[in-house]
Amino acid sequence: MKGYMYILLCSNGQYYTGSTNDMDRRLAEHQNGEGANFTRKHLPVELLYFEEFQRIDKAFYREKQIQGWSRKKKEALINGQTNELPKLAKKDFGK
């Protein structure tokens, strides 16, 4: 079963990362306040980015990976600046 990982922009300016096996249905649920508690409180939401996977578990793993990313790293992904991702992943422990 196919899966999708997606990033939404919520009305409070925060990103919401999720996964689903039906992108159209899930986006409609979020827009109608039937999605996650977080998006329900921050309507409307806008779909900014998604990736398609051959299996839903792969989409779920990708969701969990991206949820741990910084805002700047998520924005680089959304904006197609994948060459910036390694640099944004590095931590500066010297400061």
Where in the sequence are the language-model features?
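C2H2-type zinc-finger recognition helix
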Residues: I56
